[in-house]
């Protein structure tokens, strides 16, 4: 089973995550919590303060977002969460590694997730259909 919550208020997120019994807990949002971006740092700091603490408390496996139009996989020291930024199929922006970056690419594309009880794979795929990188988690 996979729990996917989108755009929910903080109180509702806490309630949903506290009752989650799924094998994998994946949260999808629009804005990144950790990512390289030329956009305002305050945007990410707010997400780290308001959202990341909730995700960590409830043992979320992966946080997936978009907003900045490039591929990024980040593992922040002290967190077991995989933070993933998904590219856009038609527009991509430059990207540079930050602390915790496992992979980043400015290629336009999309991601595909495959999940079973023991393994989660998120494949980052470019516009030609080539797998650029795979985020793998095992239970």
PLM-predicted stretches and their roles:
Residues 1-12:
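Single conserved hydrophobic/aromatic residue that forms the stacking wall/gate
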Residues 13, 27-30, 67, 83, ...:
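Divalent metal-coordination and catalytic microenvironments
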Residues 13-20:
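Short amphipathic alpha-helices and their capping/turn segments at secondary-structure boundaries
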Residues 20-62, 76, 81, 92-95:
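Active-site-proximal segments of metal-dependent phosphoesterases and phosphodiesterases across multiple
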Residues 33, 69-70:
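Alpha-helix capping/helix-boundary segments
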Residues 72, 76-139:
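Binuclear metal-dependent phosphoesterase catalytic core
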């Amino acid at each position: 089973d996979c729990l996917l919550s989108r755009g929910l208020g903080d109180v509702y997120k806490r309630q949903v995550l506290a009752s989650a019994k799924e094998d994998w807990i994946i949260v999808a949002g629009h804005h990144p919590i950790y990512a390289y971006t030329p956009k305002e740092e305050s945007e990410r700091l707010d997400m780290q303060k308001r959202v990341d603490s909730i995700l960590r408390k409830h043992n979320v496996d992966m946080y997936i977002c978009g907003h900045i139009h490039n591929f990024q996989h980040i593992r922040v020291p002290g967190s077991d969460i995989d933070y993933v930024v998904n590219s856009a199929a038609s527009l991509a922006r430059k990207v540079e590694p930050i602390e915790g970056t496992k992979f980043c690419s400015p290629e336009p594309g999309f991601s595909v997730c495959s999940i079973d009880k023991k393994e989660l794979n998120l494949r980052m795929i470019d516009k030609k259909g080539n797998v650029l990188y795979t985020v793998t988690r095992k239970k």
